[in-house]
Amino acid sequence: MKNNILCLAMMMLTIMCSCGQKETKQELFNGKNLDGWTCVLDESSTLPTTDVYGVKDGNIHIVGNPFGYMRTAQKYNNDKLHAEWRWIGEGTNSGLFLHVQDGDKLWPNAIECQLCNGKTGDFVMLGGSKIAEVES
């Protein structure tokens, strides 16, 4: 009897663990164009965004000037981000903006994860954003 109860408990535990929410992967870049992205340039720029941001050979290409950024048109939460990048030539000041707040301005309220050679992984608070330690 004890073995039957133990087997039943193990089966129920296995079923409950396998019923958990599965992670789904969503590609943010389709490799063809910038559909699903919003490109923002410094308001003093006279260039169209298409002269700065584009797609070449399945990769996003960004010209270094003027200042600006790209963001996804859709908002995400509870996410994991995987990014790959490389510099052709000497790396310059660049980064990934995280938790960008509404309002497409330069510089937005956001956290920047620095990608510049020698500073990769540093966090920079942009647009007056603040970070605080929360005790639990």
Tell where the protein language model's regions lie, with residue ranges.
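Bacterial Sec-dependent N-terminal signal peptides
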Residues: 1-24
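Carbohydrate-interacting regions of secretory-pathway proteins
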Residues: 19-136
